[in-house]
Amino acid sequence: MIQRDPNLLLSWRADQHPDAPMHNDQRYMTGFGNEFATEAVAGSLPIGQNSPQRVAHGLYAEQLSGTAFTAPRGQNRRSWLYRIRPAAVHGSFSLVEQSHFHNDFGAGPVPPDQLRWSPLPLPSVPTDFVDGLYTMAGNGGPEAMSGVGVHVYAANASMQDRFFYDADGELLLVPQQGRLRVHTELGVLALEPQQIGVIPRGMRFRVELLDAAARGYVCENFGGLLRLPDLGPIGANGLANPRDFETPHAAFEQREGTFELVAKFQGHLWRADIGHSPLDVVAWHGNYAPYRYDLRRFNTIGSISFDHPDPSIFTVLTSPSDTHGTANMDFAIFPPRWLVAQHTFRPPWFHRNVASEFMGLVHGVYDAKAEGFAPGGASLHNCMSGHGPDAATFDKASQADLTRPDVIADTMAFMFETRAVLRPTQQALSAAHRQADYQQCWSGLRAAFQPPITEDAT
């Protein structure tokens, strides 16, 4: 292990340090978008080909494609699975009535108000991950293969004999409370708050809760697959480094019984009976796979001279659009960091943005909001809606001693930023946990303008 001078760490906690353990009992392969090969039973992977006449151990070969066959090689995503039964083996689907999780973003007027919500209440009756999903906002849809759905979840029960897949988009999971063990077709992801997980479009999985209750956020990405942002003049290293992304080794379930397969397809939920666990992939190879990332390993970039840089420097993952330089969705975080800029208002500045910003708080306190923005809560600042630090934060930062650094510690906020307006759902607008008085956080910002007295004025 690299030895570091402890005096240089100052107030950083051990679990915020890049050497912090990952707190899991699973095995992982490292790297972003790598070509992986893994088998839970030796000899299951064919050598030198994908689809032999007879697969070892009586398995079936099946390709899972995440991009078009003809996508450029550097962007092509697919994996070959060697499984006990093909994915086609299940009963007929029927429509499920589920009022809270959907893609109904409405066609009516979108209020330009700044919006904020307290945390989604935890359920009082047994509720698993799928039943606990609650749609907040979104844009676009699976038909156009662009845009996102923004959801939160609150659950207190594991998915035992129930499995889910989303044919509409890949799922970015951001746990806020409670640890998860996500059993997927290609292996098991252990997730805890301050880690994220990405489940590819179409990947079947079930979510096991490791604590009494769990809550968090989900971004359903209908557009281009998430990738690492270009670093430009930053260079070859920085932000989220590829080696810190982890993909599970092959693991499988060999269970038969009465199970339920739930699918999200074209904005609706469907269910089918299935007589076995669909998580029966014994071996696989390819680059279309689930992965996780520990946000505490993010290499934060900032100013060491003056001014607060644009928040794009905090981008972890980006979903590209058809317009170069403009993302379908950016996932950015606001982690522990030092602020040392001189002659500078150090918190995030007041802003109006052509993009739309959905924010959440995983842990601690967000440095631009002294009150009201709690872990598990959320805010939405849509296109050109003014936002920025509240009055208390502005007053404190305007008088701060800039000869000393501001150490932003013990925090983790994040943002889903989209190029299209995020349309809040009716249930989010009318929710009891919506903070109707959110705008009052800026009411204390008084006019302090005092024009200079000139000789002409006297």
Swiss-Prot record:
Superkingdom of source: Bacteria
Example GO molecular function: iron ion binding
Protein EC: 1.13.11.5
Annotated binding of Fe cation, by residue: 351, 357, 387
Gene from which the chain derives: hmgA
Protein name from the UniProt record: Homogentisate 1,2-dioxygenase
Function: Involved in the catabolism of homogentisate (2,5-dihydroxyphenylacetate or 2,5-OH-PhAc), a central intermediate in the degradation of phenylalanine and tyrosine. Catalyzes the oxidative ring cleavage of the aromatic ring of homogentisate to yield maleylacetoacetate.
Keyword Nucleotide-binding (UniProt): no
Co-factor requirement: Fe cation
GO biological process, one term: tyrosine catabolic process
Pathway assigned in UniProt: Amino-acid degradation; L-phenylalanine degradation; acetoacetate and fumarate from L-phenylalanine: step 4/6
Keywords annotated in UniProt: Dioxygenase, Iron, Metal-binding, Oxidoreductase, Phenylalanine catabolism, Tyrosine catabolism
Annotated family: Belongs to the homogentisate dioxygenase family.
Subunit structure of this chain's protein: Hexamer; dimer of trimers.
One Gene Ontology term, aspect cellular component: cytoplasm
Species name: Xanthomonas axonopodis pv. citri (strain 306)
Entries under InterPro entries matching the protein: HgmA_C, HgmA_N, Homogentis_dOase, Homogentis_dOase_bac, RmlC-like_jellyroll, RmlC_Cupin_sf
Protein residues bound to homogentisate: 366, 387
Reactions this protein catalyses: homogentisate + O2 = 4-maleylacetoacetate + H(+)
SUPFAM superfamilies linked to this entry: RmlC-like cupins (SSF51182)
Family matches, as HAMAP family: Homogentis_dioxygen
Pfam family, one: HgmA_N
UniProt-annotated catalytic positions: 308
